[in-house]
Design a protein with these regions (language model features):
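Short, hydrophobic alpha-helical packing/hinge segments within bilobed ligand-binding/sensory domains
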Residues: 42-46, 140-146, 162, 243
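Residues within well-ordered alpha helices
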Residues: 22-26, 119, 164, 224, ...
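Pocket-lining segment of extracytoplasmic ligand-binding domains
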Residues: 142-231
Length: 310
């Protein structure tokens, strides 16, 4: 099989990664070598230090790098999620997001807080009425504790991690999401893409196959994840099943972002590093493999096959 090295940071990505790996092995003669790279500075250097061929999350830093080096150095090519993917939660006494004006919203300091500031602003709320809460202060994704304590009126939570918040009495408060490059966005070096065009196309086939498996055959996806080498002893099957169900709702079978999602993500990158403003974000994106698969009928055929009743 042809090897390709895929780097990630966050274990929350593993259900999708492991389905990609297994679909690539079963159907497309591709050996996806999964590598976890931490901390963030090492992860950001990995593409350029030849520690991986692809990355599967956290693409924003590539815009600032492109402004300094070259807009053609890296290629972003796949985006299975087109929104921020987190929910606003509050106690039941808060019925509408408009009631949060002048009140404090807790925001996890990790990830992309600027994307959440954009959502608040779009909803007519003041992004300055927020407080960044690092995991080290409350535990991973336990920012909801700031609402229970009365320090904050609401909190942004990942659906993967909101069970404890719901148990504490918090409920989802509707707030429009924004088009955004969400979880599982992919990038590689442009040179690698050019030199390995057929491999890249087959890798994207595996991505689409994994997406369809998760969306339409979740029981089979769960079997893949439970058998995966990265699944740790003691991982709860019911919890993994719940997570696969949540992830399935977010995935696009044609995994390429809209122009608005690209623009909004670029705005986040600029907020994180103003150097990113010197780059046209469209120059870093290539739709060629997704377009080939869509144009050939591959995606529609796979959707029809896997969504059919077994």
């Amino acid at each position: 099989m042809r090897p390709i090295r895929l780097a990630y940071r966050d274990r929350d990505r593993l259900p999708v990664i492991e389905c990609i790996r297994e679909m690539a092995r079963r159907h497309y003669d591709v050996d996806v070598v999964v590598v976890r790279i931490e901390p963030t500075d090492e992860y950001e250097a990995a593409l350029f230090d030849d520690r991986c061929d692809l990355i599967v999350e956290h693409l924003e830093y590539l815009y600032a790098r492109a402004a300094v080096h070259s807009e053609t150095e890296a290629t972003m090519f796949c985006a299975p999620v087109d929104r921020t993917g987190v929910e606003l939660m509050a106690l039941p006494a808060v019925k509408d997001a408009s009631e949060l004006r002048g009140k404090t919203v807790a925001v996890r300091s990790s990830g992309r807080p600027d994307s959440l500031y954009m959502r608040l602003k779009a909803a007519g709320l003041d992004p300055s009425d927020t407080v960044l809460v690092p995991d080290r202060d409350v535990g991973r994704w336990n920012q909801w504790k700031k609402v229970v304590s009365g320090e904050c009126a609401a909190v942004f939570m990942s659906p993967l991690h909101m069970a404890s918040a719901e148990a504490a009495g918090l409920r989802v408060l509707p707030l429009p999401d924004l088009p955004m490059i969400g979880n599982y966005g992919h990038a590689c070096l442009t040179r690698f893409a050019t030199e390995n065009d057929a491999l890249m196309e087959d890798y994207v086939r595996a991505v689409v196959h994994a997406i369809c498996l998760i969306k339409y055959r979740p029981a089979e996806a769960l079997e893949v994840v439970l058998a995966a080498p990265t699944t740790q002893e003691g991982d709860d099957a019911a919890e993994l099943e719940r997570r696969i169900g949540i992830i399935a709702q977010t995935l696009l079978t044609t995994p390429f972002p809209s122009g608005e999602a690209i623009a909004n993500t670029h705005a986040v990158a600029i907020a994180e590093d103003p150097a990113s403003a010197g780059v046209d974000p469209r120059t870093l994106w290539s739709a060629r493999w997704v377009e080939r698969l869509e144009g050939s009928g591959f995606i529609a055929g796979l959707v029809a096959e896997l969504s059919a009743d077994g």
